[in-house]
Amino acid sequence: MVAGTAWLLLFCSCRSQKPGSVDQGAHYLADSNPERVKTILFATIAPDFLYERADFFAQNGIHGFMMAHIMASWQDDIWKQPTAYTPHAPAGRVVGEANPLLRKCRRTNQRCRELGIEYNSVKVAFYKNLPDWFDDAAWRALCENFHQCAVFSRLAQFSGITLDIEYIAEMYHLDYPAYQVAGYPRDRLRSQAQQRGQELMAAMIKGFPDMIFWLLPECMTMYGPLASDLFSGMVSALAEKDSPGGIHVCSEGTYTATKPRALFGLVYKTDIKSQQVLAASADQQALEYWRRRGSISPGLWPLGYYREILDAAGNRIGYAGKKEKFGDRIIGSYADKSENYSAAEFQRQYAAGRLLARRFVWIYCHGQVFWQLSKEEMIRFHASAGDTLPVVDNLQDYLDVLRYPKILQDSSFANGSRLVREHQGLNYFTGFAPYWRHLGPFAFDQKNFSMPMAPEKTIDLQAEYTTLSGQGCWQKTPVDSSGYVDLASLYGNQKMPLAYSLAWVASAKKQPVQLGFGCNDCATVFVNGKSVFHFDGSRNAVIDEDIIAVTLPAGRSQILVKCGDRGGSHWGFYLRILEQAEKNKVRWVEP
C-alpha cells in the first residue's frame, strides 16, 4: 500500500472509530471542560500540507502547531526569499504583504482557525551562540530580527511565537570560558542578561502586542543562572505592558514522565522555581504577572525514538532506532517514528497533564510522527523525506487519546493540580529538612558508584577531607522553600562528582516511617549507617518518586545521602518525611 493511500485510510477511519479504554488499570473521567486545555504539537510541518489536511488534525484534538523552519534561528531574516517552503520565489528580501511565505502561512492559519486550530506559532531557536551580553550593536540586530519575526507572525495571523533556548546551555553558566577573560565585567553579567531578556521581549511585543509567548524548555530548572535572568527579563517586559497573551513555559523534563506523581512533581518544581526566580529579581509586577498570565505547559513525547551509537572510546558516532527494528545500524536521529511508551501510558500521562496544565499541553514530535506522505505529496507540499517515513501501526490509539480527552479520576490529584496550575502550591509538600550538612565534591568511578568512600564509613563532623575543590569539611546549608537540595549550585560545575549530605531526625517512639525521595542522578540513602535505598542510573529529581519505608528507633537517627552526578546541568535530591510520620511526632533535629 502506498503512503498516500495509507494516509487516506487513516483519515477516513478517524471519522468513525469509537473511543476505547487504553489502560484497564487506570480510572478516568471524560473531561467535562475539554476547551480549558489546548493541545499543541511541536513539529516540522509544511504550511501547504497543514492547509490541505487541517481537518484531520482538528478532528483529532489538535489546537495548534509550533511550526519549525519559518524562522529557524535568531540570526535569520524572516523576510528573506527563497525558503524551503517557497523554493521558487526570486532571491531577495521581500517585506510585508508581498512576501510569498507570509501569504502561504496566512492562508494556512485562516483555514486552521475556521476548523478550531487557533494556536499556531512561529518557532525560533537559539541554534547559534548569542552575541556577547555586552555587545550593544549585536543585540540591537538580534532584537530587530525578533521584532521582524513578530511583525511577520502578526500579519500571517499566527497566535504568537515559540522560543527554544536549549541549544546554547553552556552560555548560561557563569564559568563559561568567555566570561573568564581578564577584565570581563562578570559582576554585571546577571543584570545584563536580565536586561537583554527585557529588550528581546520588548522588541517582540512592539511588533505583535497581543501575541502568546511560549518558552522552552524550563530554563530556570535546567540551565545556569543566566537563563533564569533572561527569563525574568522577558517576564518583566511582558508585565510592563500587561501583555494579554501571557508566557507559557513548556517543560521538557516531563517528556517521558508517564506516572502522574512524577509528572506532578516536575511541574510543581518548575512553577516554584519560576516564582523564586521572579521574586529574586525584585520585580513584584513581574511576579504578579506570572501568577495571573503565566503557566507551565507539560511536554509529552510519546512517538519518535532514537538512541545514540557510541564507539569503543564512548564517543557518539550516530543515531539508531529501535534495536528490534534496526539493530545498531546508524539511520539518523529522526528516522524511526516508533513509540517511546505505549498508548496506555500516553493516556495516563495526558490525563494527568490536562489537570496540571493551566492553558496548554504540548507534544514534542521527534520527526513527523503523526502522519505519512507519499513521495508525490512530499514534493507537492515542499515537505521533507521524513514526512514519507512510516508511522506506528497503532497510531489511531495515540490519536484517540487526544481526540477523546480524559482526566484522572482522582480527587486528591485534581485538587493538588489545581493549586499548582494556579501558582498556589508553594507549601503543598512538607516535611523537608531545614538544613543539611554537605561534604564534597568527590570524584567517583562512574561504573562503580557503590564503592564506599571515607565519609560513609565514619561520620566525623570535625574531620577534613581531600575534595575536588581542595581540603573540605562538613558545611551546614539551608534548604530553600521548594525542598530541593541543589548540589550543583552549592559546588558549581564539576566533572560528574558526588557529594554526601547529612541530617538527623528524632522519633518519639520506635515506629515505621516513610520517606519521600527523588534524585538527580544516582544516590544511596543510609539510615543509621544502613543502606535503605539505592539508584544507580540517570534521571531528573522528582519529589516522592521513591517511597522509602524504614523503621526508626526511639530517639535520634542519622540520615546520610550519597548523591552522584552523571552529567547535565542539574545535580541534587529531594528527601522529606511524609505527612503521616510528622503526625506521629517525627521531626528534623540538630546533632
Segments the model singles out, each with a brief description of its role:
Residues 2-10:
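Bacterial N-terminal signal peptides
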Residues 10-26:
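Bacterial Sec-dependent signal peptides at the C-terminal "C-region" and cleavage site
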Residues 21-419:
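Glycan-processing catalytic domains of CAZymes
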Residues 415-487, 561-591:
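Accessory carbohydrate-binding/adhesion or oligomerization-edge regions at the termini
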Residues 489-499, 536-541:
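Extracellular beta-rich ligand/substrate-recognition surface
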Residues 501-513, 549-554:
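Extracellular and analogous surface-interaction loops
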Residues 507, 511-526, 559:
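Aromatic-lined ligand-binding clefts that engage carbohydrates, nucleic acids, or primary amines
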Residues 527-574:
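Beta-strand-rich ligand-recognition modules
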